[in-house]
């Protein structure tokens, strides 16, 4: 985490290995950038967010509550609540709905025995 500005991380977040969160930025134009000027923009990650491995979160991004970010994503813009998003640049793929309650990767479902333990 490069935190020249605030980084707010909500409750019950999961981050896989090699997640990077950056708040720092530099000017685009070379002469201005060479002045060593640096700025920071706050990053906010909501509650119940899962960031897949090797995800990069860029300065100024707000990730809403109950979001899944796919592995290898580069998050350059805000992601709304209840979204599955992935890619470079990261884009919303779809909303998370009640139909996803028992879903695993590639639309597999949690088996009944495991589901009973989760619900206990």
Regions from the language model: what does each represent?
Residues 1-62, 96-97, 102:
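Flexible, glycine/small-residue-enriched loop-and-beta-strand segment within the central core
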Residues 77-82, 112:
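Short arginine-rich
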Residues 61, 73, 79, 88:
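Short beta-to-alpha loop/turn elements within the nucleotide-binding domains of ABC transporters
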Residues 25, 78-79, 89, 96:
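Nucleotide-sugar donor-binding loop of glycosyltransferases
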Residues 89-120:
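Terminal amphipathic alpha-helical/low-complexity segments used for targeting or macromolecular assembly
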Residues 50, 68, 74, 84-86:
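Short-chain dehydrogenase/reductase
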Residues 14, 67-68:
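Short alpha-helix at the nucleotide-sugar/activated-sugar donor binding site of glycosyltransferases
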């Amino acid at each position: 985490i490069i935190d020249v500005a605030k980084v707010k991380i909500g409750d019950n977040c999961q981050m896989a290995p090699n997640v990077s969160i950056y708040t720092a930025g530099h000017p685009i134009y070379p002469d201005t950038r060479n002045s060593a000027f640096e700025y920071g923009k706050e990053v906010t990650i909501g509650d119940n967010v899962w960031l897949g491995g090797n995800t990069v979160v860029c300065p100024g991004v707000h990730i809403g509550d109950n979001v899944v970010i796919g592995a290898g994503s580069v998050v350059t813009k805000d992601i709304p609540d209840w979204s599955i998003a992935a890619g470079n640049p990261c884009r919303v793929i779809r909303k998370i709905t009640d139909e996803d309650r028992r879903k695993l990767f590639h639309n597999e479902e949690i088996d009944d025995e495991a589901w009973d333990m989760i619900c206990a």
